[in-house]
Amino acid sequence: MTKQTKIKHYTKRDYAAFAYLAPWIIGMLVLQLYPFLSSLVYSFCNYKITGTPSFTGLSNYIQLFTMDNEFWNSLKVTLTYTLYTVPGKLVMALAVAVFLNRDIKGINLIRTLYYIPSLFGGSVAVALLWKIMFMDNGVINAILTTLHLPNVQWLGDPNQALRTICMMEIWQFGSSMVMFLAALKNVPADLYEAAEIDGASKVKMFFSITVPQITPIIFFNLIMQTIQALQNFTSAFVITDGGPMKATYVLGMKLYKEGFSYFKMGYASAISWIIFIVIMLITLVLFATSKWWVFYGDES
């Protein structure tokens, strides 16, 4: 094959592929890579939207760690929110998946109904609906009154507000549930048959067979839900605006306020990179510890 033939072949096929990929590549460079790198530069600058960035070194980070108590509170709230929602969502998703892993009449409709909340994700509409339901004169307190039970300040009590936000997140377990359900379908039936012959109980089969077989999916859901929880913003912003008394003031809220209320874009960029580093560190820890409990193939 001559050099000319190679060039002709490359031009016809590979350039066509590049042409199809070009919109995605351009979009990634403009909408993702450029903001990602520019935020890193701005995090070392004193930069307001209407002004010109001026390099200040590590001053934004020093201020965050040594002089900004609000930052430490928001970090604490974010980690607490993550510790509540991630295990809660995974346990709920797995429990429902086990319940739905059966062949009965209408099971597809039931699975769809359980999945519907996740279609809306962390949308503003869902957050507004949740706020209306849990306000002092909302639907939930009306039900409690009907049952002659005391009303609860779901959104007004600093000790309760974060739990209410967490309940909304756990309620949207559908995406994890679908993945768990697919994993359960792939567990070999002969393992259960052998265990049943040996006289193993349902509980023992679940923890000795089911859980080890689906640990890769548990790990995947754990990573994805942890990242999502650490980036939470919509529910805290729409439902409580970070209150009461900063009880739901997550890092996403802190970033938003600094950047778009106080227009301190350099400071907000530093916060965004702290969020990125926290996510990266927690993810690395999860990957490092996975070798002790995640089983692939015949390892289980």
Regions found by a protein language model. Give the residues of each.
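A structural signal for multi-pass alpha-helical bundles of membrane permease subunits
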Residues: Q4, K8-S300
